[in-house]
């Protein structure tokens, strides 16, 4: 697949006028952008693989930036991605709150090495759970609390207020390491006893039931104040000593706000996003087009590095 003339022109201009070839990198969201689910399996499209390989060959940083938790990244496509990188993978997880490197252990197993973490404060955890308490007091029991400890080995823990629902929740959310239905006060005590990087509140109830509790969104990601994907990208870019202003960024949802912090923003898919790159913005229809653009960007960067 080749890129269109208009995309080629924008890409050439960005690489010509920026320091992408020497100081930039690539930041990409995962689900819906660089990876897709196919027949129940998460896969990296071939075009994306080829584009990624060209960037890895050049040796410039390539950062993953995802809502997923580290254990999920490792379990779903970590092996496939590591075959492309053949080196530790810079990874921003949990909406910017936990970042580090997916790497091989001495036993040749994939593991996560933390570089930085920004867990919720006790007051932030209590505030999130106060919203849940309000729903429970109002008779709404279709509430799930997903929480993600800083210790990446724990993975994803889900709490339901209905013990009879544990098996159903386990079946529906197979990524969870544990599903619990402890009493609400004990849940709060457990969460306050450890570093929690992100909480996800999921409410499955009719709109009319929720009217009195508008402070609790139907679905709500909770991280430490000021922490999001853009924040995480900036912290990791500093760690990698690359400049986001000279980088490409690819995403597909409104949570991918790092797109507003990169030089060239690549908006993938059909969602109408308002993000604009600092230098320019390119709209792509799918991940196949993203792969073709990444491949071409690596070619142009290599040409600039060789010929100036």
Regions found by a protein language model. Give the residues of each.
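Glycine-rich phosphate-binding "P-loop"
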Residues: 34-40, 217-221
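Conserved Rossmann-like nucleotide-cofactor binding loop
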Residues: 33, 40, 70, 255
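Mg2+-dependent phosphoryl-transfer enzymes with acidic/Ser/Thr/Gly-rich catalytic loops
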Residues: 2-4, 21, 25, 45, ...
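Conserved acidic, metal-coordinating active-site core of Asp-based
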Residues: 135, 140-248, 254-262
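Active-site phosphate-binding/coordination module
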Residues: 46-162
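Non-catalytic pre-domain segments flanking phosphatase-related domains
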Residues: 1-30, 34-35, 46-57
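A short, compositionally biased domain-edge/stem linker segment
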Residues: 6-18, 183-186, 292, 297
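Short glycine-/acidic-enriched loop or helix-start segments at secondary-structure transitions
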Residues: 37-38, 73-75, 102-103, 259, ...
């Amino acid at each position: 697949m080749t890129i269109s003339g208009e995309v080629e022109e924008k890409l050439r201009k960005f690489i010509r006028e920026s320091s992408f070839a020497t100081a930039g990198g690539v930041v990409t969201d995962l689900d819906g952008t660089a990876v897709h689910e196919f027949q129940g399996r998460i896969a990296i499209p071939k075009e994306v693989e080829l584009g990624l390989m060209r960037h890895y060959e050049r040796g410039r940083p390539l950062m993953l930036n995802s809502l997923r938790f580290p254990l999920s990244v490792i379990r779903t496509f970590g092996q496939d991605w590591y075959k492309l990188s053949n080196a530790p993978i810079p990874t921003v997880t949990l909406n910017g709150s936990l970042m580090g490197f997916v790497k091989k252990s001495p036993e040749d197993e994939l593991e996560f090495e933390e570089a930085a973490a920004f867990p919720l404060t006790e007051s932030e955890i209590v505030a999130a759970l106060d919203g849940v308490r309000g729903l429970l007091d109002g008779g709404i029991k279709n509430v799930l609390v997903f929480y993600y400890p800083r210790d990446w080995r724990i993975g994803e823990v889900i709490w339901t207020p209905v013990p009879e629902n544990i098996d159903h929740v386990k079946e529906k959310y197979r990524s969870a390491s544990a599903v619990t239905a402890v009493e609400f006060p004990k849940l709060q005590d457990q969460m306050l006893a450890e570093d929690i990087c992100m909480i996800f509140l999921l409410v499955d109830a009719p709109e009319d039931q929720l009217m009195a509790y508008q402070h609790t969104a139907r679905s709500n990601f909770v991280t430490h104040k000021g922490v999001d994907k853009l924040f995480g990208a900036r912290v990791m870019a500093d760690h990698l000593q690359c400049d986001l202003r000279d980088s490409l960024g690819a995403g597909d949802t409104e949570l991918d706000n790092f797109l507003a912090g990169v030089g060239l923003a690549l908006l993938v898919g059909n969602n109408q996003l308002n993000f604009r790159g600092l230098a320019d913005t390119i709209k792509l229809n799918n991940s196949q087009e993203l792969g073709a653009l990444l491949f071409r960007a690596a070619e142009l960067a290599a040409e600039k590095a060789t010929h100036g």
